[in-house]
């Protein structure tokens, strides 16, 4: 029986474990904090649970246009408020429940789970340290799926009370009076949008000239317009030089010397791979300058028999991609039929209000001449159903080959964009016009 050892219990790890078990391998999975990884315990599941409440609040706030009244109260915002302590209790409860569900699935497939830390000792041995002591596990195949953690700025050390990373916000008992969000990437934009909808005064500090610098420019423009309309302060081309805690809040000093005061500060400036202390050098596993493990399209590292999946590889850091990388690794390691990872049909979503979803070739690639394609944009403002639902902001943009009109990419901005984008993904995969 093939022995498989997996380091990391996130989507890349537990999905690989399920595939390995189904292919009759002897599978052991190790994680320090519990099954589900950051996706379940501190990132995707918690943030999307928080965002679910934010979406409901947005619907309530915009319901007046559709003729909804709450008694005789004219100011709906004064009636509809949130209990952040209850929201965060629900967040933690759902994360724990999902982790338990994953544990149950793995147990049913006879996968051994060890709560502890692990490191490689060569390309065929994993050393595990747990409450039961140290154990050496020999392996025919090893998968490293250790994820990543929030990048910490020396000028903004988190204290878990006023200066926070996105893993610490779920300990808050009360809604911040004024939240300063540093970083306008996906994580920063999502939290800024969510807390704005929950009723918090939000200041979004972006070092670039627009929010979501890595996303479609037209989509980012729509989002920034909506956020400002809803009362958010967006400071573009403003780099945070220092964050200092005061007696009852925080002061953020910008690079131009100006300051912004708030009650709390959320730092969302990217991630760092969890690859230190794993013994990768003992197996000659190559990492890049940022510490991410280099892999090919079937998740192989530079070391024979050692695979990697998920955020620790830096390959399109999405839970769905991590899961597919893990499955591909097991199919390849265990000799099953395998199709290399193809990111051109993988959609990525930003769960702001409105949502932003993209797939395939981008506007930037088209403009740079990387692919010969033309774009077609359909604003939601002119769509009959959008009008019925009171939707004013957003669009559908498709990138198509000249002549046959084959769809090669797309962007959707609007309610449920994360679901609508799947039709575009299928069109790309099927070569539809």
Where are these regions (language model features)?
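Beta1/beta-strand and adjacent pyrophosphate-binding region of the FAD-binding site
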Residues: 1-12, 175-185
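Flexible, glycine-rich terminal cap/loop adjacent to redox cofactors
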Residues: 5-12, 16-33, 38, 45, ...
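Short glycine-/small-residue-rich Rossmann-like dinucleotide-binding loops
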Residues: 10, 31, 147-148, 266, ...
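Core beta-strand elements of the Rossmann-like FAD/NAD(P) dinucleotide-binding domain
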Residues: 1-2, 132-141, 255-264, 302
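Gly/Ala-rich phosphate-binding loop of Rossmann-like dinucleotide-binding domains
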Residues: 17, 21, 192-197
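FAD-site-proximal beta/loop scaffold in flavoenzymes
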Residues: 159-176, 259-335
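Glycine-rich flavin
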Residues: 2, 18-25, 30-175, 203, ...
């Amino acid at each position: 029986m093939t022995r498989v050892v997996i380091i990391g219990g996130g989507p890349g790890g537990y999905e690989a474990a399920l595939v390995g078990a189904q292919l009759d391998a002897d599978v052991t999975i190790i994680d320090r904090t519990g099954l589900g990884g950051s996706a379940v315990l501190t990132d995707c599941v918690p943030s999307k649970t928080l965002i679910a409440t934010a979406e409901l609040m947005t619907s309530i706030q915009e319901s007046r246009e559709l003729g909804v009244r709450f008694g005789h109260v004219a100011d709906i915002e004064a009636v509809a408020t949130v209990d952040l302590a209850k929201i965060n209790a629900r967040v933690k409860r759902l994360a724990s429940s999902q982790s338990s569900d994953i544990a149950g699935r793995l147990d049913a497939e006879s996968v051994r789970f060890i709560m502890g830390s692990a490191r490689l000792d060569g390309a065929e041995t994993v050393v595990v340290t747990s409450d039961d002591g140290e154990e050496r596990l020999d392996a025919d195949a090893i998968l490293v799926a250790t994820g990543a953690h929030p990048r910490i700025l020396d000028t903004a050390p988190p204290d878990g009370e006023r200066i926070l990373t996105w893993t610490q916000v779920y300990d808050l008992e009360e809604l911040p009076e004024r939240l300063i969000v540093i970083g306008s990437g996906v994580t920063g934009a999502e939290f800024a949008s969510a807390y704005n909808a929950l009723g918090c005064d939000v200041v979004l500090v972006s070092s670039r000239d627009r929010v979501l610098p890595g996303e479609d420019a037209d989509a980012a423009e729509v989002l920034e317009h909506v956020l400002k309309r809803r009362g958010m302060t967006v400071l573009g081309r403003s780099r945070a030089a220092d964050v200092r805690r005061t007696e009852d809040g925080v002061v953020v000093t910008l690079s131009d010397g100006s300051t912004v005061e708030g009650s709390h500060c959320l730092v969302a400036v990217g991630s760092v791979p969890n690859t230190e202390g794993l013994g990768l050098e003992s197996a000659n596993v190559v990492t890049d300058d940022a510490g991410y493990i280099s892999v090919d399209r079937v998740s192989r590292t530079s070391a024979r028999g050692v695979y990697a999946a998920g955020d620790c590889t830096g390959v399109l850091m999405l839970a769905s991609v991590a899961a597919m990388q893990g499955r591909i690794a097991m199919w390849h390691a265990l000799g099953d039929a395998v199709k290399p990872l193809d990111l051109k049909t993988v959609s990525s979503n930003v769960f702001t209000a409105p949502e932003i979803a993209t797939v395939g070739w981008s506007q930037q690639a088209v403009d740079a001449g990387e692919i010969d394609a033309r774009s077609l944009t359909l604003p939601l403002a002119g769509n009959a159903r959008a009008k019925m639902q009171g939707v004013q902001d957003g669009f559908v943009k498709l990138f198509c080959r000249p002549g046959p009109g084959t769809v090669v990419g797309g962007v959707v901005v609007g309610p449920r964009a994360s679901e609508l984008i799947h039709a575009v993904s299928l069109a790309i995969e099927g070569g539809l016009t």
